[in-house]
A protein has these predicted regions:
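Compositionally biased intrinsically disordered regions enriched in Thr/Gly
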Residues: 2-11, 23-152, 156-258
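Bacterial Sec-type N-terminal signal peptides, specifically the leucine/valine-rich hydrophobic h-region
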Residues: 17-20
Length: 258
């Protein structure tokens, strides 16, 4: 059974990590390594007033998850946070672990491996936390080349709940159309070039499922092959929030842009 070690304070593991350990037929470890990055700031003086998410510090950490299901072998670092509002921290961490579990569960019936390619707590804002996980999928035995798989998590730090496209856009079709239009405007300036694959930006939830909330805008991460050939790598565009002003939920606009 896979073991799990955390540096710093102990953290209860969610069911997805327990499932990884339970089905593993190899020894493995999961290790969290706190970084030195601290965002936001705690109050300088004691107070008896209720503490808001904005006054609590969140520290970026990481967790190494290793093991095997028999069909899938994985050794992946996932982004995590510590500190702050425990409900927000728990929601973000569980969501990132669930994102990895989805990648382990959701790729056909053939044997494969998953390894780390990129992981980060991409943005910790006053009201929102965004996380990025990119793993490297490879056939087992290895095929022609690995394929990156993208996952993102966006959590409302005021309510400790994930923010979905349906939450962000009250009129979802209108929101998706705006994302499609803006992507068509922005993609020619990326490595995808003017001949980008247009089916990859059709106004569907699947095409815009991977996004991060940043102060600059809605950072959209396209999957491998989605808007161009494998050779160009993963492509991202950032749609400014003001370009989405007519379709975004007014109550969420200050949250995602914080």
């Amino acid at each position: 059974m896979s073991g799990i070690r955390r540096s710093g304070r102990a953290v209860a593991l969610v069911a997805v990590v327990l499932a990884l350990a339970a089905c593993s037929d190899q020894a493995g470890t999961a290790v969290s390594e706190p970084s030195t990055t601290t965002t936001a700031s705690a109050a300088d003086t004691p107070t008896t007033e209720a503490t808001t998410s904005a006054s609590l510090p969140y520290n970026e950490t990481e967790l190494q998850v290793t093991g095997s299901t028999g069909r899938v072998r994985y050794d992946v670092l996932i982004p995590q946070i510590e500190g702050g509002n425990p409900a927000v921290t728990g929601e973000f961490n569980e969501s990132m672990r669930a994102a990895l579990q989805d990648q382990i569960d959701g790729w056909g019936t053939d044997a494969f491996t998953l390894s780390s390619q990129e992981h980060s707590v991409a943005h910790i804002g006053e009201h929102v936390i965004s996380g990025l996980l990119v793993t490297s999928w490879n056939a087992d035995p290895p095929g022609a080349h690995p394929t990156p798989i993208v996952a993102t998590v966006v959590v409302n730090a005021d309510t400790a709940t994930p923010i979905t496209l349906g939450d962000l856009f009250p009129d979802l079709p209108a929101g998706l159309q705006a994302l499609s239009d803006e992507s068509a405007r922005l993609l020619p300036a990326t490595v995808a070039g003017p001949d980008f694959e247009r089916s990859g930006i059709e106004p569907t939830e699947a095409n815009f499922a991977n996004w991060l909330a940043t102060p600059a805008g809605m950072e959209i991460h396209f999957n491998d092959y989605q808007v161009g050939p494998h050779a160009v790598g993963l492509v991202t565009v950032t749609v400014p929030w003001d370009a989405l002003a007519d379709v975004i939920d007014p109550a969420l606009a200050p949250v995602v842009s914080s």
